[in-house]
Amino acid sequence: MCSSDLCDRPYAAGVQRQRAIVIGSGFGGLGAAMRLAAAGLDVTVLERLPAPGGRASQVVDRGYTWDLGPSLVTMPWCFDELFALLDRDFRQEVELVGLDPFYRIDWPHDGTRLDFYGDIPRMQEALAELSPADAANYPAFLEASRLIHENAVLAAGRRAFENPVPFAKLLPTMLRLDAARSLAHFCGKWFSEEHIFQSMSFHSLYIGGDPYRVPAVYAALAYLQVADGVWYSKGGMYAIVRAMAQAIEDAGGRIRCDADVDEVVVRGGRAIGVRLADGEGVPAEIVVSDRSEEHTSELQSRLHLVCRLLLEKK
């Protein structure tokens, strides 16, 4: 399904850069837009909501502000690298405050409380109040988590998993590190006291993952907060959204809000643009989706999906 007004629309006079559309303005979409802008593309971000941010949006009411998504920053060097691509200094644009302790976990049903610290001996002292044996195992747990972080997370994080082959190559490493079994199983090897076990295995809940079902690769989250610290951005996480949006616009990109993408238009096996819910066609040579795989598939035209299914059956 492809209309001539979209498919054959030429570049504007004097415009020769490739056009790129990014669907969605969460951290992933904004980050992709910054990278595309740094590569010299003409970038447009299309956001369904009235303001950018996606799951990192905010609500302001009667003088109070709430972040609706993430509330803490880990691995801040990822933002450092991203902003540097556009010759910007992330730390000059967003004020980060290191947290100590990182956070506190409360169990209201029995009054237990546990503070998380970056300093390992101090953390062991806190754990020892609940279980000296588990406290003694904490350094070994962190070391095992470090190996997962460095050999699985960092190694895989910069790979494109466009087919099963790269994932298959990663499996031996995950098996060797015991990262392919559940996070709960992995943490259970080191901790038996229930509160400590829960505090070391809950990090997958950040992305809605059940510790008893997700792989132990998520144990890396426990290590990276010790390695890189846990930070709060002054003004909330939305301060980072604002800084990213500003960087995109300063690089010549555009962020269009209230722009609900209804379809990714495909011709000849390639995306050539999108069609908005109001019928407007937006042409581009590159289309990047920050939506989930399921929602992205729903955006592809029925004609394209039928053609792809027929080709796959041949």
Predicted regions and their residues:
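N-terminal glycine-rich phosphate/pyrophosphate-binding loop and immediately adjacent elements
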Residues: 16-150
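Helical element adjacent to the flavin cofactor pocket in flavoenzyme catalytic cores
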Residues: 220-276
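Flavin (primarily FAD) binding-site architecture
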Residues: 289-293, 297, 301
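Generic, well-ordered alpha-helical scaffold segments in large soluble proteins
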Residues: 36-39, 186-190, 199-202, 243, ...
